[in-house]
Amino acid sequence: MQKNAAHTYAISSLLVLSLTGCAWIPSTPLVQGATSAQPVPGPTPVANGSIFQSAQPINYGYQPLFEDRRPRNIGDTLTIVLQENVSASKSSSVNASRDGKTNFGFDTVPRYLQGLFGNARADVEASGGNTFNGKGGANASNTFSGTLTVTVDQVLVNGNLHVVGEKQIAINQGTEFIRFSGVVNPRTISGSNTVSSTQVVDARIEYVGNGYINEAQNMGWLQRFFLNLSPM
């Protein structure tokens, strides 16, 4: 008796664990890796006894006199103005119909069918029809606005800057995360050290959160289980 109870308990535990796994939906973050970068010190030049040196160390505190200071090195900051407004709509409809009719007769009925048709002429008629109507439509709209300051984590060979950044906002018992990454052309950076997100190449914008509000939006494990099994 105890052996059967232990066996039943083990099966029930495995079933509960498998059902719990149905509740978790894995998600891959759009922005992966570190969301900040530290300035990289350049190599120390070797003094050659001349006024003009072959290499000069990077001076991160350099302030241009006749030009705006713009990010150009790893660790420099840049403000991204989020101006995303995307909308899409799609509709489709289809109609199909088909009708058919067949008519044929027998002048002479075989003897073994006379009980069914009689001795007179037998006529057979068949008709059929098929009609199909279908309609579909979809609408989507997405608006994202705000600002986020990011850091240059890579300077590409052609001079473009790969930037990445994150902003965390704690509200009551939940935390909101805004992450951004992309490639910026230095020519699109304004004098106020800002660039619109619409001018960023390969932009990745992610807005997620955690806490009880985010957990309330997740489907329960039992409901998720029946959703996976339901054919409807």
From Swiss-Prot:
Primary residence: membrane
S-diacylglycerol cysteine lipid modification positions: C22
Keywords: Bacterial flagellum, Cell outer membrane, Lipoprotein, Membrane, Palmitate, Signal
Protein origin, superkingdom: Bacteria
UniProt subcellular location: Cell outer membrane; Bacterial flagellum basal body
An example Gene Ontology biological process: bacterial-type flagellum-dependent cell motility
Secretion signal span: 1-21
Cited HAMAP family: FlgH
Record's subunit section: The basal body constitutes a major portion of the flagellar organelle and consists of four rings (L,P,S, and M) mounted on a central rod.
Protein's UniProt name: Flagellar L-ring protein
UniProt lineage: Bacteria, Pseudomonadati, Pseudomonadota, Gammaproteobacteria, Enterobacterales
